[in-house]
Amino acid sequence: MNLVQVNIKSGGYLKKDLILNDISFAVKSGELVGLIGPNGAGKSTILKTVMGQLPYMDGKIDFPNAHTHYAYIPEQPVLYDNLTLWEHLEFAAAVGKMSRETFVSRAEELLKLFRLYKEKHRLPVTFSKGMQQKVMLILGFMMRPALYIVDEPFIGLDPHGMRDFLQLVDQVRQDGAGILMSTHSLDTAEKICTSFILIHEGTIISQGNLEAIRQQSRLPEGSLFDCFISLLEMQS
């Protein structure tokens, strides 16, 4: 089942300065779709378009189920200066109309998983970048939406944090959620994504599972990195 269908003819922050062209894809239940490309390729702009945050867009973003909820986990943590970690979680639960019992259970489980339980009454603005990234992951996964939109989740995460994130990804996929994740960490993406959308200068240069990407790049046994470089060379 499609959780979101994206058809962007063009898009940008100004109508006269378009960044995206001919972007079409879907994210299905149980999928982890990797939005792959270098810095400045348009990955974050695509995510903003999916969420309706791009000032100009010619196209359509369709959520087939009108009741589909999504969680957005940004690359840069967004935190309140005067709220403790626990108060951040309480605020998110209140916005999501989560019962107190469900909130406490999920919050404590995630805090323990990411080894932040002892820090729950501290101010996250004083945390390291990696710890702040874990806070954003906890906030997103606590809500258990049907769709996760994740922007560069690996930046700042230590190996334990990355393992915990990947464990949660597997769990929510098994529960039927879909994930759209942007990253330029091709080695990790190759291991965990079910399909890929390769972006260059705001345009899709290839998409599909790894086998399809290999066929399109004419590298039958190539890594995702090698395939991406080959496709870029074909564009030039």
Regions found by a protein language model. Give the residues of each.
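A short, flexible loop at the N-terminus of ABC-type nucleotide-binding domains that lies
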Residues: 1-6, 10-22
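The feature captures the beta-strand-to-loop junction immediately N-terminal to the Walker
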Residues: 36-38
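Helix-to-loop junction immediately C-terminal to a conserved catalytic motif
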Residues: 51
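Conserved ABC ATPase "signature" region
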Residues: 90, 94, 101-119
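Conserved ABC ATPase signature
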Residues: 123-130
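Catalytic Walker B motif of ABC-type/P-loop ATPase nucleotide-binding domains
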Residues: 148-152
